[in-house]
C-alpha cells in the first residue's frame, strides 16, 4: 500500500505555508494525510487509493488565485510518477474556483459523479497522465 513519505508531506506543507502565509499542522489517520492551518482557513486532504490513484479533497485556501493549487498539483503529479501511479482524483469539487482550476489543468469530470449545481459542475474530476 502506497503512502506519502515525510519528505513529500513536508513539501506540501511548505508549499501551503509559503503561498498562504500561514502555519500548518499535519495529521495522519489510516494512511490519509490532513494538512490544516492553525487559523482553520486552509485545508488539504491527500491519500493514495491503493496503487491505482492519488486522491485529494477538502481543498480550502484563504488566498485564491495565487498558484497554491498549481504548485500542489505539480508536486502530487511528481509523487505519483515516482510511484507508478498515473491518475489523480480531485474529490468533491464544489466551488467555481475549483471547477475552473480543474478545467484549466486538464482534469476531466467523472461522468458518474458530477452534476451541475448552480452553474458549477460539482463532483469528482480525473487528472490522467
Give the location of each predicted region.
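Short amphipathic alpha-helix that is part of the acyltransferase structural core
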Residues: 1-32
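Conserved acetyl-CoA-binding loop-helix of GNAT-fold acetyltransferases
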Residues: 65-78
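Conserved hydrophobic beta-strand within the GNAT/NAT acetyltransferase core sheet
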Residues: 88-92
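A conserved beta-strand-loop-helix scaffold within acyl/acetyltransferase catalytic domains
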Residues: 32, 36-53, 57-58
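C-terminal "cap" of GNAT-fold acetyltransferases
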Residues: 114-129
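A short, internal acetyl-CoA/4′-phosphopantetheine-binding micro-motif in the GNAT/acyltransferase core
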Residues: 57-66
